């Protein structure tokens, strides 16, 4: 039987307690990976994966989490930088606190999620990093200047890491989801949700599991062994 080659690979997913992160954790477990996830709380219901309470905005917190994960599961092969937040408003109304919160989680948080693991990947000459960007990081979105800027930054970060890591056999890619059915998008007002749906050629929002499969592909040492520095769009042709 064909396999993505993720069996027994140790993979860390940040923001893995619910939503897209939880779907990624579940799928990777089903593929035989040894999965750990970090979040501000680990009570989302997945009792099989190793949950570690950690804050992606705090490098010391993530370094401590990395030590615990490595001690319990072994050397880490893959990191999925999924944790993210929004603080939406029109540009003139965005406060310094709105900017700082989103930059700290969505951009610095991605760097701090990767940093504790990457030197080990370089030493072992194997590893795959996948960061969750967004359709907003490529096309922008009204009321999301801060969010869009961070998600564009994530793409730039992965492209740079891909160039740095190539000589060590370490790949770095981004997944850019469109509108996905999560707690975040379910909070969108119904009339706005209907308007967005009509703009999507598939005429529906995506599912967290569809993002999880894209992540699994990019993590795979079999299916995507020569893929690095790329952005995989999963948006139902909303942005091509």
UniProtKB/Swiss-Prot annotation:
NADP(+) binds at residues 18-20, 82-86, 177-180. GO terms for molecular function: acetoacetyl-CoA reductase activity; oxidoreductase activity, acting on the CH-OH group of donors, NAD or NADP as acceptor. The keyword Nucleotide-binding does not apply. Substrate binds at residues 134, 141-144, 178-179. Disruption phenotype: Double deletion of phaA and phaB leads to loss of synthesis of PHB, no visible growth phenotype. It is an enzyme of class 1 (oxidoreductase). Changing residue 134 to A: 12% enzymatic activity. InterPro entries: NAD(P)-bd_dom_sf, PhaB, Sc_DH/Rdtase_CS, SDR, SDR_fam. GO terms for biological process: fatty acid elongation; poly-hydroxybutyrate biosynthetic process. Poly(3-hydroxyalkanoic acids) (PHA), of which PHB is among the most common compounds, are prokaryotic intracellular storage compounds with potential uses as a renewable, biodegradable thermoplastic. Cyanobacterial PHB synthesis is particularly attractive as cyanobacteria use CO(2) as the carbon source. Changing residue 151 to A: 5% enzymatic activity. It catalyses: a (3R)-3-hydroxyacyl-CoA + NADP(+) = a 3-oxoacyl-CoA + NADPH + H(+). It holds the Pfam family adh_short_C2. Keywords: NADP, Oxidoreductase, PHB biosynthesis. SUPFAM superfamilies: NAD(P)-binding Rossmann-fold domains. The active site is at 147 (proton acceptor). Its EC number is 1.1.1.36. Pathway: Biopolymer metabolism; poly-(R)-3-hydroxybutanoate biosynthesis. Belongs to the short-chain dehydrogenases/reductases (SDR) family. Catalyzes the reduction of acetoacetyl-CoA to (R)-3-hydroxybutyryl-CoA. When expressed in E.coli with Synechocystis PhaA, PhaC and PhaE confers the ability to synthesize up to 12% (w/w) poly(3-hydroxybutyrate) (PHB) depending on the carbon source. Nitrogen-free medium induces chlorosis in Synechocystis, leading to the degradation of the photosynthetic apparatus and concomitant accumulation of cytoplasmic polyhydroxyalkanoic acid (PHA) granules which in this cyanobacterium are composed of PHB. This is Acetoacetyl-CoA reductase. It comes from Synechocystis sp. (strain ATCC 27184 / PCC 6803 / Kazusa). The gene is phaB.
